[in-house]
């Protein structure tokens, strides 16, 4: 079977079975969330932009927000026959892309995104196997659904497996 590469855009998500790859680019302060069921060989990838939807009304794209995207991704995976108890997560991104003179948490969207993703994964009882968070460089996340492997390409730093 030919391996298909499926792009996941900003504020987007997708699912795939083995042996396909889900790829998202442009993870600066955004966070990529790869969820994988080893038993079924099925996974999903979400690219979130913001930590929390509660400050917004009339939400047109719930995948933009960590608190909404993770439960939606889990639901989509369950529709494909995944058992939520088998899901494991790998996450990347959450960089501080801009140097603000105000170092308050409100300005550090990358850190807030990372914290929100960890919180919602814990709430959904999905353990995090590995992470590549923080720093100040953009990342690309490549999720191989055949084994659940995630490679991170960081600007100026090469590729590593998490």
From Swiss-Prot:
UniProt-listed InterPro entries: CheD-like_sf (IPR038592), Chemorcpt_Glu_NH3ase_CheD (IPR005659), Cytotoxic_necrot_fac-like_cat (IPR011324)
UniProt GO BP: chemotaxis
Similarity-based family: Belongs to the CheD family.
Annotated keywords: Chemotaxis, Hydrolase
Known function: Probably deamidates glutamine residues to glutamate on methyl-accepting chemotaxis receptors (MCPs), playing an important role in chemotaxis.
Designated name of the protein: Probable chemoreceptor glutamine deamidase CheD
Molecular functions (GO terms): protein-glutamine glutaminase activity
Record flagged with keyword S-adenosyl-L-methionine: no
Name of the gene this protein is made from: cheD
NCBIfam families (alphabetical): PRK13490.1
Top EC class of this enzyme: hydrolase
Catalytic activity: L-glutaminyl-[protein] + H2O = L-glutamyl-[protein] + NH4(+)
Keyword Cell division: no
Position of the signal peptide: none
Its EC number(s): 3.5.1.44
Pfam families given in the database record: CheD (PF03975)
């Amino acid at each position: 079977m030919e391996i298909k590469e499926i792009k996941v855009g900003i504020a987007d998500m997708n699912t795939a079975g083995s042996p396909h790859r889900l790829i998202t680019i442009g993870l600066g302060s955004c966070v990529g969330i790869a969820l994988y069921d080893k038993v079924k060989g099925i996974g999903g990838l979400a690219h979130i932009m913001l930590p929390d939807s509660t400050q917004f009304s009339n939400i047109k794209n719930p995948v933009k927000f960590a608190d909404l995207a993770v439960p939606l991704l889990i639901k989509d995976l369950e529709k494909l026959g995944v058992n939520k108890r088998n899901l494991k997560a790998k996450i990347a991104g959450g960089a501080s892309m801009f140097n603000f003179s105000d170092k308050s948490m409100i300005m550090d969207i990358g850190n807030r995104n990372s914290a929100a993703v960890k919180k919602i994964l814990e709430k959904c009882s999905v353990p995090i196997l590995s992470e590549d968070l923080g720093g100040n460089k953009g990342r690309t996340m490549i999720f191989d659904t055949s084994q659940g492997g995630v490679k991170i390409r960081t600007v100026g730093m090469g590729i590593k497996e998490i």
